[in-house]
Amino acid sequence: SNTEQEEEEELEEEESEGEDPDDERDLGKIFAKRVQWLVQNLASRSQVVEELVGDLLHVFKMLLSDSFFPVLKPAIGVGSAFEGWSPHEDDVVYCLLVPLKPPRGHTFHLELGTAGKIQVKDSCIRVVLECTCTREQLVGDMLCFVHNPEEELRRNQDPSLLDTLCTGSYLDVEKTALWFQNFVKSAWVVVPQSHHYNMEVLPSSRSCKLQLTNASRRTLFVEMMFGVQQGDSDIFLSSENTEAIFTPSTTWPESYAVAEVKFFKHMARQVPDNSVHLKCLQLYARILVGTGFSTYALKTAVMHLLTSTPLSGWRRRDFLLRL
């Protein structure tokens, strides 16, 4: 927006005026103001992205209500941008997790991978057809996939999820991502924001990545991942990439991203006003860009400090100590 651009230009002017190395106090103020602007900018843009993705999923819901594709639940903003920080000032990627529920006549069975590890990375989602004979008799909106002849099903009903987005009996990440990407391309014109943004679907085998450009040539990068919830927990089997060289398309690694974003939102309500925990995270994340050190490891360390350090110790005067 114009306001964002004006604030950014004002900050740049202050930075150029404050380059006297003897004036450390002014530089500290400029840095603090810069980080505060970045955090506020992330919050406002995150809200824009959430609204846009919500409208997109609403179109999906309307057009796929009678299908046998996965049921898409409201997206959950995850990752650094929705936690209030980012290792990058430009080209921030706004990540969202779209929970999947089984369509009618299907159930999901989560087969967790190797036990005993901190994060299970080789889990699968088995798709099983369930009997809907009672529904067929009472509602009459579908034929039972289990007890009707294949020929009748082929003639009178769309294919089951097993025949569209699965490999064998398992939900396929890459087929799901490609299906979603193709649907976004065809459904975008119906989304209200299509009048304000030019949309491009970027290559991705395990998610849906969008590049949105407005009339001012400002760009938003959005990545939608998919996940199936483990019971009532905040742990999901997700489509996110792993560090492995090769990840089978039927592999859905565990993700704690939803639990982590909830942790940061909870802490935001507990810490003192003007807490510096996000400023510390933002500063170190920027410093570590290009070093090969994992920003996820850095975030984990800050999360540990937030639970082990008295919350009163995150005030502005504690900034250098916390660093």
Residue ranges and their predicted role:
Residues 1-94, 98-170:
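N-terminal regions immediately upstream of nucleotidyltransferase
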Residues 85-86, 120-323:
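Catalytic cores of NTP-dependent nucleotidyl/adenyl transfer enzymes across multiple folds
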